[in-house]
Amino acid sequence: MAYLEELLEPFESTVLGTLGSNGYPFSSYAPFYYDGEVVYIFISDIATHAKNIQVTPKASAFFIEDESITENIFRRKRISLQCDAKKIDRESEQFAPIMQNFQEKFEGGTLTMLMGMKDFNLYALTPIYGEATFGFGEAYNIGGEKMNQLVTRTGDSGHK
């Protein structure tokens, strides 16, 4: 059984989909850290996707294989997670360990600099359902107790 943690390992950023106040979807991207259950993003409150999450605490996180890796554009590996979103307060006991993991993943000073900026905040994106596609006819739902496993499709898309 494949787990999301292995599948998301090569990715450093996720494409975010959020819902704007005008009712239209908005796409952007953000670096992320995944702990095996939750996708964490550290984004500025000035950014449109942060404002959207604050109003409608839901987001999609989309991960897609680089185009240069495959010979057939239609066979790109991709994972789409539909998530509930929640801001993690800087004062919470979760904040420091998650940010430490972020720093280890992205070895460099940029994240340290951003941590000092008060408009940047940590958000937890908790998957409630998702899909993974690895080529023609190789599609799975995301499921399991912690919503972190590939589950063979049975004809039901798993959407709520």
Predicted segments with their positions:
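Catalytic micro-motifs at enzyme active sites that drive phosphoryl/nucleotidyl and oxygen chemistry
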Residues: 19-21, 28, 68-71, 109-114
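Surface loops and adjacent helix of pleckstrin homology
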Residues: 44, 64, 135-137
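Short, structured beta-strand-loop surface elements
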Residues: 48-105, 120, 127
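An N-terminal domain-cap segment
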Residues: 1-54, 62
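C-terminal edge-of-domain segments
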Residues: 100-101, 105, 109-160
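Conserved hydrophobic/aromatic beta-strand scaffold that supports enzyme active sites
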Residues: 27-31, 80-82, 120-124, 139
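A general structural signal for well-ordered secondary-structure junctions
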Residues: 13-14, 59, 108, 112
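Structural motif
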Residues: 38, 58, 129-131
